[in-house]
Design a protein with these regions (language model features):
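Short C-terminal tail/terminal secondary-structure segment
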Residues: 142, 216, 227-242
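Active-site helix of classical SDR
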Residues: 117, 153, 161
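Alpha-helical segment proximal to the catalytic Tyr-Lys
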Residues: 122, 166-167, 224
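Residue(s) in the substrate-gating loop at a strand-loop-helix junction
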Residues: 137
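Canonical Rossmann dinucleotide-binding motif of NAD(H)/NADP(H)-dependent dehydrogenases/reductases
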Residues: 2-30
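Short, small/polar-rich loop/turn modules that mediate ligand/substrate recognition or access, typified
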Residues: 169, 174, 226-228
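Substrate-binding pocket helix/loop in short-chain dehydrogenase/reductase
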Residues: 93-95, 101-103, 196
Length: 242
C-alpha cells in the first residue's frame, strides 16, 4: 500500500501508459484503466509490478466508473489522484461530421472526465494532497478546421476543468489540465505525424513521457499552490497557429 494512489484513464498505450510508468516511479500506486482490455493487461503485465493494477473502464459509463473506483480502493487501499487522459480523435469537416461521431467525441472527451470527477469525489475529499489532471489539447486553445467534434469537446473539457478547480478548491482538491500538442502516439497515423513534424517550430513531435512529466508535476507537492492551471506541452505549436 502507498499513501498516494492514482487512477489513470486511457492507460493501455501512448500517453496514458507513459503517465502510469511515471507516476509509479514517483511512488504512487497506480490503477491503469482502459477499454482495450487485452492491450491494457499486456501493458501492465510487462511492468511486473504489484503497485500497478489493470482495471477495465469505459469512461462514458457511470456504472463502470463506480465499479472501477471501488476496485481501486479495495486493491490499493485508497484513491488520492485522478488523471482523465482517455480521449478519441477523428477529423471531419462540418458538412461530413455525423451526429454519432460528434456525440462519441463528447461522451469520451468530456462526459468521461465529468463522470470520473464525480465518481472519485468522496475519496479525494478525504485525501491529503488530492489532485485531478485533465488531458485537454492545443485544439482547445486554437481552432483547428475539420475538428468540430474533437475540438469542441476539448474546449468543453477546458471549461469543466476551470469550474471544477473553482468549486473543489475549498475541499483541498486541486484541478489542473495539460494541453498536449502533436505527440507521437498511436492516435496519430504516420501521414499526420509527418505533416505535423514539417509544420513544427521544434522540428519534431513530442514524446509521451514529456506529457507524463507535466502530469507528474501537477499532481506533486511541488504544485501544491497551483489549481486551475493550463500547462501547454506543444513544442511551440500554438505559436504558429493564428
Amino acid at each position: 500500500m502507498t499513501d498516494r494512489v492514482a487512477l489513470v484513464t486511457g492507460a493501455a498505450r501512448g500517453q496514458g501508459a507513459a503517465i502510469v510508468s511515471r507516476l509509479r516511479a514517483d511512488g504512487f500506486g497506480v490503477a491503469a484503466c482502459d477499454l482495450r482490455i487485452d492491450e491494457l493487461n499486456a501493458c501492465v503485465d510487462a511492468l511486473d509490478d504489484t503497485g500497478v493494477i489493470a482495471v477495465p473502464l469505459d469512461v462514458a459509463s457511470a456504472d463502470q466508473w463506480s465499479t472501477a473506483v471501488n476496485t481501486v480502493v479495495d486493491r490499493l487501499g485508497s484513491l488520492t489522484t485522478l488523471v482523465n487522459n482517455a480521449g478519441v480523435l477523428h477529423r471531419a469537416s462540418l458538412a461530413e461530421e455525423t451526429p454519432a461521431g460528434f456525440e462519441r467525441s463528447w461522451r469520451v472527451n468530456c462526459l468521461g472526465p465529468f463522470l470520473g470527477i464525480r465518481a472519485v469525489l468522496d475519496h479525494l475529499r478525504r485525501a491529503d494532497g488530492a489532485a485531478i489532471v485533465n488531458t485537454c489539447s492545443t485544439g482547445a486553445i486554437r481552432p483547428f478546421p475539420n475538428h468540430a467534434a474533437y475540438g469542441s469537446s476539448k474546449w468543453a473539457l477546458r471549461g469543466l476543468t476551470q469550474i471544477a478547480a473553482a468549486e473543489l478548491a475549498p475541499s483541498g482538491i486541486r484541478v489542473n489540465a495539460v494541453f498536449p500538442g502533436p505527440i507521437e502516439t498511436p492516435m496519430l497515423d504516420e501521414a499526420t505525424q509527418a505533416r505535423l513534424v514539417a509544420a513544427s517550430v521544434s522540428g519534431r513531435l513530442g514524446k509521451p513521457v514529456e506529457v507524463a512529466d507535466a502530469v507528474s508535476f501537477l499532481v506533486s507537492d511541488h504544485a501544491a499552490f497551483i489549481t486551475g492551471a493550463e500547462l501547454v506541452v506543444d513544442g511551440g505549436q500554438c505559436l504558429r497557429i493564428g
